[in-house]
Amino acid sequence: VEYGRYLLGSDTKALCPYPEIIGESEIKIPGVTPISGWAVETSITEKVVDVDNRNEFVAYLDADKCGRSLTVRSRIDGDHFQPLGFDTPKRLNRFMIDLKIPQTWRERVPLVCRDGQVIWVVDYRIDDRYKVTADTKRVLKIEFKRV
């Protein structure tokens, strides 16, 4: 029993919706990058688009703040990020506990990083410092699709 869920069986990771991510992989921008059971699709638009936040597997970020070198990895001890809407950074572990992400799933949640810094906890929240604003000139769209 974890956060009001009953998990039967000896391997609760088998019920995890995220494929295991091994190591750290660079994302092609723009393009499609296959990563551990995911197809990560990226594109850049020169104007601000209507940001649709209904799909948690799609993020819209300020492309100029993100740069051209992003990676995907799982969490490591000491990770911090500034969740959208927060004024200060938060420990990733505390963020996951607060959202009641099952402990056995936390190692598998994909993280998009820039220079080792988490900028998107896929399926949950982007980093506030990389959000699209009125001053954004180019928008980076990143979409994770299961394969």
Model-derived segments and their meaning:
Residues V1-V147:
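AMP-forming adenylation/ATP pyrophosphatase catalytic core
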